[in-house]
């Protein structure tokens, strides 16, 4: 819905087929469940954006090739405005992923630090400053997908997704 034709062509199939793992970079230590109060900043440097900040509770961040990060691009407007989503290469210089160890020793969740991470302008997802609308769409789709995942155990849900993809002919 928000991706450009080039983004759809480049990223959607490997994401859909799980050839490439993606993560969502939403939550921040000081924001709790108030996504709009985030403090991770993306500053336009002319060629792209420089991102600085921290995300937490990032599921599979340590395995992800790509991430969807929501940032503040305009600090001078109300908090639900001035947010922008980007596609970020998790292997970029300045991305530091730190696993959060659970009592079991496992670490599906991570803290992710961004220090002067360069993101090209073509990696904006949606429109500059329209990140709140994008976040609502992502979260609503996620909730529908979770609710729709009530399938019989062993029924081959990933195989079903790949079949749906192949039927779309993208």
Residue ranges and their predicted role:
Residues 95-170:
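Glycine-rich beta->alpha junctions and the first turn(s) of the following alpha-helix
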Residues 4, 86, 114:
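Residue-level signal for inorganic ion chemistry
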Residues 30-33, 57-60, 75-77, 101-108:
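Short Gly/Pro-enriched turn/cap motifs at secondary-structure boundaries
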Residues 40-43:
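A structural signal for short hydrophobic beta-strand segments in well-ordered beta-sheet cores
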Residues 34-36, 60-64, 79-82, 106, ...:
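Short glycine/proline-enriched turns and hinge-like loops at secondary-structure junctions
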Residues 52-98:
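A short core secondary-structure module
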Residues 1-28, 46-47:
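FAD-binding glycine-rich core of flavoenzymes that anchor FAD
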């Amino acid at each position: 819905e928000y991706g450009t034709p080039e983004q759809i062509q480049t990223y959607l199939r490997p994401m859909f087929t799980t050839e490439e793992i993606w993560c969502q970079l939403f939550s921040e230590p000081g924001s709790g469940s108030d996504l709009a109060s985030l403090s991770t900043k993306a500053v336009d440097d002319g060629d792209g954006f420089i991102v600085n900040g921290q995300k937490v509770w990032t599921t599979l961040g340590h395995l992800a090739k790509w991430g969807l990060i929501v940032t503040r691009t305009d600090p001078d407007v109300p908090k639900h405005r001035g947010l922008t989503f980007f596609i970020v290469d998790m292997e970029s210089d300045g991305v530091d992923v730190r696993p959060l160890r659970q009592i079991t020793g496992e670490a599906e969740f991570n803290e992710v630090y961004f220090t002067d991470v360069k993101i090209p302008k073509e990696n904006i997802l949606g429109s500059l400053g329209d990140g709140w609308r994008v976040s609502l769409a992502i979260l609503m789709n996620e909730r529908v997908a979770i609710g729709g995942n009530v399938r019989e155990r062993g029924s081959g849900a990933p195989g079903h997704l790949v079949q749906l993809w192949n039927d779309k002919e993208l």
